[in-house]
Amino acid sequence: MYAIISVGNRQYKVTQDQEFLTEKTGKNAGESFDAKVLLFAESNNKVHIGQPELKTARVSLKVLEDVKGDKIHGYVYKRRKNYQKAWGHRQQLQKVKVVSLSAV
């Protein structure tokens, strides 16, 4: 059984007890929440397609921990003007676990 859910601005294909990284959701570590938008679910070879989303299916998620993504470096310069600027960024992420998955 698997489902396609939308968390934040991204879509994820998830199964029972799967852990994945997502953008920061505003929840603290240890808190549980439901995926608000469920787009697709498959169970026992039956396919449920949302138009645009499923109302009967439910996916419960639990935030395990807050993590940071890989460092991204950037560099800007202007030739012959003695102007240069370096910057870096680390995306705030959360590790999330699928607690329960019900299709109907």
From Swiss-Prot:
One of its GO terms (cellular component) is cytoplasm. GO terms for biological process: translation. NCBIfam families: L21. Signal peptide: none annotated. Part of the 50S ribosomal subunit. Contacts protein L20. InterPro entries: bL21-like, bL21-like_sf, Ribosomal_bL21. It holds the Pfam family Ribosomal_L21p. HAMAP family: Ribosomal_bL21. The keyword Nucleotide-binding does not apply. This is Large ribosomal subunit protein bL21. Belongs to the bacterial ribosomal protein bL21 family. SUPFAM superfamilies: L21p-like. The gene is rplU. This protein binds to 23S rRNA in the presence of protein L20. GO terms for molecular function: rRNA binding; structural constituent of ribosome. Keywords: Ribonucleoprotein, Ribosomal protein, RNA-binding, rRNA-binding. It comes from the Bacteria. The keyword RNA-binding applies. Coiled coil: none annotated.
